[in-house]
Regions:
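Mg2+-dependent phosphoryl-transfer enzymes with acidic/Ser/Thr/Gly-rich catalytic loops
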Residues: 2-10, 27, 190-270
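Asp-based phosphoryl-transfer active-site loop
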Residues: 7-23
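Active-site phosphate-binding/coordination module
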Residues: 25-127
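Hydrophobic packing residues within well-ordered alpha-helices of enzyme cores
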Residues: 30, 55-59, 167, 171, ...
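Short active-site oxyanion
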Residues: 41-45, 65-67, 154, 214-215, ...
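A general structural signal for well-ordered alpha-helical segments in protein cores
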Residues: 52-55, 96, 164, 199, ...
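Short, structured coil segments at secondary-structure junctions
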Residues: 62-65, 73, 174-177, 231-232, ...
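Conserved acidic, metal-coordinating active-site core of Asp-based
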Residues: 102, 106-219, 223, 227-228, ...
Length: 270
């Protein structure tokens, strides 16, 4: 173990393109490293844009026990085994209605997440892509999607990068003061409640454990990881991370397909 990291009490790890390989699996080596980290008394939390339905299999495969998971990029903290909700903040209904009205007008692909259900208008290449990448099972509601009364945990727009740029430009003046717009991938635009982020959720979780943010190492790759990377005592971006994530991190570790996170942990924390 690197003595300069002897104060670390917790690690927060993003899932997609950080912990998970491109085939959505984790190596036995990574599983062993995380198990040894827990045995040493260092807490682990997964911090992801995913919903519980698709984050749980990741945690179960790692055999982490009943760890808290930061879901929906900070909109929900939920325990892995018990499904107990520690914290939840939904997207305001008024903003959702305006977003869905625009989506209907311009035929955007918008997904809604309510009660651990993934709700779409109809099946298309975007829903197929999301299901294949995360293992989620979508429900297709047709125009009923635009009439939902319950506030969602998150909305997400999926499209080609140039179209996501246009969607972002359209939504920012419309609801930018009421929601947070953040990309989890270049072609995924997440829409979550204002003042919700992985970093804010991690701060809340750390307070619950009596752990200062200076005692946490975070790992990430994408725009929705930046709030977390910028708030923890030490931040590590994977080699495949977007440039902004690398800029706010103290260090860049290996590629997500090469056990980059686990190799850094073994070298510095074990």
């Amino acid at each position: 173990m690197d003595p300069s990291f002897s104060h670390i009490q917790m690690v927060a790890i993003d899932c997609d393109e950080t912990l998970l390989r491109s085939d959505n699996t984790v190596s036995e080596y990574t599983k062993d490293v995380l198990h040894r980290l827990q045995e040493k008394g260092i807490r682990i939390t997964l911090a992801t844009g995913r919903m519980y339905q698709t984050a749980k299999p990741v945690g179960v495969s790692l055999n982490l026990g009943n760890v808290p998971m930061i879901l929906f990029s900070g909109g929900l903290i939920q325990e892995l085994e018990t499904a107990h909700k520690v914290f939840e903040r939904t997207v305001p209904r008024a903003a959702v209605q305006r977003i869905l009205q625009l989506a209907r007008e311009y035929d955007w692909h918008i997904q809604s997440y309510i009660d651990d259900r993934l709700l779409c208008h109809h099946r298309n290449w975007q829903s197929d892509l999301y299901e294949a990448q995360t293992g989620a099972k979508a429900e297709f509601l047709g125009d009923s999607l635009y009439e939902l009364s319950q506030e969602p945990n998150k909305l997400i727009a999926i499209d080609r990068i140039e179209n996501i740029d246009r969607i972002t430009a359209s939504l920012t003046p419309l609801v930018g003061d009421e929601v947070t717009l953040v990309r989890s991938q270049k072609d995924f635009l997440e829409i979550i409640a204002r003042h919700v982020s992985k970093g804010d959720a991690l701060e809340q979780l750390a307070r619950q454990y009596g752990i200062g943010m200076e005692h946490i190492v975070s790992f990430g790759n994408a725009e929705n990881d930046i709030s977390m990377l910028s708030k923890t005592g030490y931040a590590v971006a994977v080699d495949n991370a977007v440039e902004h994530a690398k800029l706010v991190s103290r260090e860049v570790c290996g590629h997500h397909n090469d056990d980059g996170v686990a190799r850094w942990i073994e070298e510095h924390l074990l």
